[in-house]
Design a protein with these regions (language model features):
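Extreme N-terminus of proteins, especially the signal/transit-peptide cleavage junction
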Residues: 1-3, 346-347
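N-terminal Rossmann-like or analogous alpha/beta NTP/dinucleotide-binding catalytic cores
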Residues: 2-139, 257, 296, 306
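Pocket-edge structural micro-motifs
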Residues: 7-9, 84, 145, 195, ...
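A broad detector of the eukaryotic-type serine/threonine protein kinase catalytic domain
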Residues: 10, 47-48, 144-149, 207, ...
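Structured ligand/cofactor/substrate-binding pocket environments in proteins
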Residues: 15-24, 40, 45, 54-59, ...
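Residue-level "edge-of-site" marker
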Residues: 83, 149, 351
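Conserved nucleotide- and phosphate/pyrophosphate-binding catalytic cores
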Residues: 157, 163-360
Length: 360
């Protein structure tokens, strides 16, 4: 069996460092590993419209923003297929068929759906498309016969529901769909990077994001405003690293090379943490180090983004070619699904040439 990856993002805004450590960095590594036969990266505009139906221009404008961030991070169209979800109509048809295999009560129990509904204040009136988001995601994954799906921790319930749909379809119609494996980030800090205010999730509406495209001064300003240990008032006070946003970011981004380059008094992060916990290390010094680390990581990303910003027609051509390739792959899966469900009427010569028998 071919080893295939599918992953992607909703185009509702520029991508931030949470996206980077949660998924993007890993995608580039997987793409470059040579271990996979195909890598599909989807800009999920149709899913974005499920809670932005009245604001299509927001989704439309952000497709190019996400594409620029992809290319800036190192996703290579020669190695990965970058495509737009709505340009692959087979995904909608697959979603419709899978809906018959999932109950409303099962969707209601999905923790990710429940959290998203609460966050968007949809309790009173949930758009049907948004409610069926996990089914749409299952269609995306199975359409490309993905064997591995790299996701952040918050998407784990979605992937579990996808596997349920695969098992149900295969048990009803015969072995047709590929059962995907889930791949989570290895570093706990990367599972869900908090916002700079210490809140559980980065959000554009909360204004607590560091974007991949932020300029150096913006990054520095955001780092210096980060939430730390509120009880660490004086430098000599012992500090807590648990729930300390600065140290969470250092867990996700810093390497021993960064210490050698920017903070040679410490060999690694463990030494820095130990000093902070026993007292005598100020928050400003730690924040300055984090700023240097982030600038070092984000500078080449920002430079590549500036390069592609001057070549927008070329970016759209990359998406056009990728969408065409993705459509061909999804069409092949849809053909197999229709055949398994026995709704491929005009491909079935035996059916069309069968003598009429009256039904009783």
């Amino acid at each position: 069996m071919s080893k295939i990856i599918l992953t992607g993002d909703r185009p509702t805004g520029r991508l931030h460092v949470g996206h980077y450590v949660g998924s993007l960095r890993q995608r580039v590594q997987l793409q470059n590993s040579g271990a996979y036969d195909k890598v599909y990266i989807m800009i999920a505009d149709a899913q974005a419209l499920t809670d932005n139906a009245e604001h299509p221009e927001k989704v439309r404008k952000n497709i190019i923003e996400v594409a620029l961030d992809y290319l800036a991070c190192g996703l290579d169209p020669a190695k990965s297929t970058l495509f737009i979800q709505s340009m692959v109509p087979q995904l909608t048809e697959l979603t419709f068929y899978y809906m018959n295999l999932v109950t409303v009560s099962r969707l209601q129990r999905n923790p990710t759906v429940k959290n998203e509904i609460k966050m968007r204040n949809f309790e009173a009136s949930i758009p049907t498309g948004f409610f069926c988001y996990p089914i749409s995601q299952a269609a995306d994954i199975t359409a490309f016969r993905a064997t591995v799906v790299p996701v952040g921790e918050d998407q784990l319930p979605m992937l579990e529901q996808c596997k349920e749909i695969v098992h149900k379809f295969n048990s009803v119609y015969g072995e047709t769909l590929v059962d995907p494996d889930i791949m989570l980030p290895q570093n706990d800090a990367c599972l869900r990077l908090p916002g700079i205010d210490g809140k559980a999730k980065m959000s554009k509406s909360l204004g607590n994001c560091i974007y991949l495209s932020d300029e150096p001064e913006d990054i520095k300003k955001k780092v210096m405003s980060m939430y730390t240990d509120p009880d660490h008032v004086r430098v000599e006070d012992p500090g807590k690293i648990e729930c300390n946003t600065v140290f969470t970011y250092l867990d996700a981004f810093s390497t021993e090379e960064h210490f050698a380059k920017f903070l040679p008094d410490y060999a690694n992060l463990d030494e820095l943490k130990a000093h902070y916990k026993r007292g005598g290390l100020g928050d400003v010094k730690v924040k300055k180090f984090l700023n240097n680390v982030l600038q070092d990581v984000l500078e080449p990303i920002r430079e590549r983004r500036h390069y592609w910003e001057q070549r927008i027609p070329e970016v759209y051509e990359i998406l056009r070619a990728g969408s065409k390739e993705a459509e061909a792959a999804a069409a092949a899966t849809l053909h197999d699904v229709r055949e398994a469900m026995r709704i491929n009427y005009f491909d079935d010569e035996a059916l069309m040439n069968q003598p009429y028998e009256k039904q009783h």
